[in-house]
């Protein structure tokens, strides 16, 4: 079905990513690739100066370690960590890497989502490829 599947995972995820990876295994072609992606939120310079010098590097390394644990044991599965803003970074990454399916986890929408919009909602609205939403 799909040749290149993207699974965005929050660096601080407490949800089990197994459901997303299991779905990817079902909908993938035999030679397709799965990419687990974490976005470390960009910290503006006026805030970053209050953090330890190596904080962003530490955040990226920690995210890579968590993603690698999730990816272990799955064929043609790679990981990537980028710094940016979640929804925009997911959409840009999908476009640049010719992703044809995004599997995104979502929570039940709350009152604030109607004003702010969740990452999943923004990805669904603006993606140029198929999007599967897991609850």
Where are these regions (language model features)?
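General small-molecule cofactor/ligand-binding pocket signal
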Residues: 35-37, 78-82, 132
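Short, flexible loop segments at boundaries between secondary-structure elements
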Residues: 126-135
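Glycine-rich, Arg-bearing micro-motifs that act as flexible, cationic patches
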Residues: 104-126
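Small/aliphatic-rich secondary-structure junction motif
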Residues: 3-50
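Short beta->alpha linker loops
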Residues: 62, 81-85, 135
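A short acidic, glycine-rich active-site loop
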Residues: 53-65
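Short secondary-structure boundary segments
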Residues: 38-40, 105-107, 135
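Structural beta-alpha unit
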Residues: 71-102, 109
């Amino acid at each position: 079905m799909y040749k290149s599947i993207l699974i965005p995972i929050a660096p601080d995820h407490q949800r089990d990513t197994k459901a997303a990876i299991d779905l990817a295994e079902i909908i993938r072609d035999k030679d397709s690739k799965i990419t687990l992606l974490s976005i470390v939120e960009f910290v503006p310079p006026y805030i970053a100066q209050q953090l330890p010098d190596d904080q962003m590097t530490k955040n990226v390394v920690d995210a890579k370690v968590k993603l690698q644990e999730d990816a272990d044991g799955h064929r043609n599965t790679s990981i990537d960590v980028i710094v940016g803003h979640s929804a925009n970074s997911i959409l840009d990454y999908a476009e640049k890497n010719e992703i044809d399916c995004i599997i995104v986890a979502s929570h039940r929408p709350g009152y604030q989502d109607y004003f702010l919009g969740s990452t999943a909602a923004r990805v669904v609205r603006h993606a140029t490829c198929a999007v599967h939403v897991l609850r």
